[in-house]
A protein has these predicted regions:
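Active-site SXXK
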Residues: 74, 86-114, 143, 276
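Mid-domain, small-residue-enriched loop/turn segments at the edges of structured enzyme/sensor domains
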Residues: 153-212
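Conserved catalytic neighborhood of penicillin-recognizing serine enzymes
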Residues: 120-155, 162
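A short, well-structured edge-of-sheet supersecondary motif
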Residues: 48-81, 110-113, 266
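Bacterial N-terminal signal peptides that target proteins for export
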Residues: 4-17
């Protein structure tokens, strides 16, 4: 019996040894994890921002969608970041990004001819050059810096239409953004319609891919960012919510239901850039949009990220 007991204990110990070691490893892992992470700053920032965004929605009687990424710290601020909104003219940056991906810089000197019949509802630049046409580079400038709708339509046609633009987005991993129509129809999005919509997170991720990633050459990225930095339509939106000395590259958009959007890259002094997307709309189809809503939301985001001039 004594021998039997010893055999049992030894045998049992051998069988249990791997389990004990695994349990110890697990406990050690759990212990380290608990030591290393008090509630992540990211979560705390999101919760703080969320309360403020709710108050902002009430103040403006609007709906907000926000995604911000500090590329230096990997911290985010999100609010309705996976909900769909009409993207309106913000998509023009992504379309130019897709154009750059598919063409050399030299190919952008190709001149595109068009007629007065191609002009749509907003053509501050293209209407001046019906007789001569414009190069792809000039169309990109008109589309991003002046939000010229005809310029954007001509770029979309160069890509092969909305369906081919969508394929380009899928190739960079954007499975959410849903191009379906040309300007100006794409700005009319009824509640529940997914055409020409995206989410704040998807737009931010695609913007980051084109403007800050390595999918484009440095020369192409610089060209895209330069157009956004010299944008003429965004002074009262994200730009109005950051300190004056910070650099901002952005693209705005507006549409039915008071849609007002801005997608941007922000460079605080001596820090890595912040990617910020703010989308908004209202309940009534004929509602007016609010530029100040976007500026106020920007201030909340930067406060939540604890980004300063220092």
């Amino acid at each position: 019996m004594i021998v039997s007991k010893k055999f049992f204990h030894i045998s049992h110990y051998k069988k249990m040894l791997p389990v004990v070691l695994l349990s110890c490893a697990t406990l050690i892992g759990c212990s380290n994890s608990n030591i290393q992470s008090e509630p992540p700053k990211q979560t705390k920032q999101e919760n703080t921002g969320n309360h403020s965004f709710v108050q902002l929605e009430k103040e403006y009687d609007a709906k907000l969608g926000i995604y911000a990424l500090d590329t230096g710290t990997s911290q985010t601020v999100t609010y309705r970041s996976d909900e769909r909104f009409a993207y309106a003219s913000t998509h023009k940056v992504l379309a130019v990004g897709a154009l750059l991906q598919k063409n050399s810089i030299e190919a952008l000197d190709q001149r595109i001819k068009y007629t007065s019949e191609d002009l749509v509802n907003y053509n501050p630049i293209t209407e001046k050059y019906v007789d001569t046409g414009m190069t792809l580079k000039e169309l990109a400038d008109a589309s991003i810096r002046y939000s010229d709708n005809t310029a954007q339509n001509l770029i979309l046609k160069q890509l092969g239409g909305p369906s081919e633009f969508k394929k380009s987005l899928r190739e960079i991993g954007d499975t959410v953004t849903n191009p379906e129509r040309f300007e100006p129809e794409l700005n009319e999005v009824q509640p529940g319609d997914t055409r020409d919509t995206s989410t704040p997170k998807a737009l931010a991720t695609s913007l980051q891919t084109y403007a800050l990633g390595d999918i484009l050459s440095t020369e192409k990225r610089n060209f895209l960012i330069d157009l956004m930095k010299r944008n003429t339509t965004g002074d009262n939106l994200i730009r109005a919510g950051v300190p004056r000395e910070w650099e901002v590259a952005d693209k705005t958009g507006s549409g039915s239901y008071g849609t007002r959007n801005d997608i941007a890259i922000i460079w605080p002094p001596n820090k890595k850039p912040i990617v910020l997307v703010i989308l908004s709309n209202h309940a009534k189809e004929d509602a007016k949009h609010d530029d100040k809503l976007i500026a106020d939301a920007t201030k909340i985001v930067l406060d939540a990220l604890k980004v300063t001039n220092k």
